[in-house]
């Protein structure tokens, strides 16, 4: 691997902060020079309160007693390091839920010009849980109907959907079926009877990335994925029964089949499980070899990458597409199980309960898209890590049903807090490559959360709020407690006020199922 650029001498916080300037009430700019070799600026969407959080993290990093101990660099440094990657255009963009991660910060968007032969693809810009995403189903049920049975319904969901670390799926999957899943995505779900035709229409990429090549997925990745189809997993993944709490845009909400406060919806948050993690892990070794061969230098080893046009780059994109297809089938399988649970509870088939998919979005993926850069339409490889595609009205890649509203964007809150449906805007298309936030974003590490919170207290608070809770690993709930995250409403409002997405519906949970 080519040597990483030598780090600049340690600077004081004041030295570092001089490179971070306020553009407006919703945005700060990280100027070139903040880290070596920046080709574009960093642009971070934050309001005053969220700005204070990212600057506090930078201040802690600059304190000689608080850093140099390993771990991730602060989010501002990671955003700037991405701005130094070959072929990057526009800006390295961070959304309000940004926090440090592996390579790219979580909440980072970066686009690379396919027409530039030096442009790269980086697994760190997608993440280990490839196509981690969110799906929302609506129903014609009301809180008055579901509230009295929410405990039983939460238990039914918990019984139907395998959850937790190492959970095994109940959707029968043979090695041959897995090959088809990796290649076909939701077309497999449709063929096998686990999805409705409209589900596919209301899924990003229509639930299938066409460049998928199962031969590029390792045997180990397939072995990990085989038993996990239709499983929720652990961490911040969940299935929630939610009710409509507020409607901000009645026209858009009605297009989504949401027409009243108190209407019951179901949100599913999960990804590609062990298969996606293994695809990412496998790619890093190949990327390091490619960097050494092609003389690619990066500021951080975790930004291992390869030229898009290289064999390594193409192999990763083909394997990543397989993992993305797996994730869509995984969420489709859980949708099937969720529909079964509701049908059993209410004694009606799912179609009579109007259990249609509103939309399914990915927030860990890299895709080829057309965007305007400096007045010229270009094909870009857009990396979205912990950020969501948010295309505007009339965009050709969003469903007919949403041509007048813009793409629905699903923003999951933290355990026990509200979630949101947003819609994409033209301003977002211009300013953020058609991207917005994906959730609340961590404010406290998992490790710190485990040390300062008690799981009994977290569960008791949820019960006090009237939320039914089923958890496979109770001692891990501290990691996902609301206190461990930023305020999702602050995050969503920042994006709304900046004009990069528009608030449509607010949802609140009445039952939560977690791993």
Swiss-Prot record:
Binding site for Mn(2+) 2: 132, 269, 363
Cofactor(s) demanded: Mn(2+)
Top-rank taxon, per record: Eukaryota
Active site, renumbered: 438 (gmp-histidine intermediate)
Pfam families, A to Z: RtcB (PF01139)
Family: Belongs to the RtcB family.
Note: Ligation probably proceeds through 3 nucleotidyl transfer steps, with 2',3'-cyclic phosphate termini being hydrolyzed to 3'-P termini in a step that precedes 3'-P activation with GMP. In the first nucleotidyl transfer step, RTCB reacts with GTP to form a covalent RTCB-histidine-GMP intermediate with release of PPi; in the second step, the GMP moiety is transferred to the RNA 3'-P; in the third step, the 5'-OH from the opposite RNA strand attacks the activated 3'-P to form a 3',5'-phosphodiester bond and release GMP.
Name of the protein: RNA-splicing ligase RtcB homolog
Organism the protein comes from: Ostreococcus tauri
Taxonomic placement: Eukaryota, Viridiplantae, Chlorophyta, Mamiellophyceae, Mamiellales
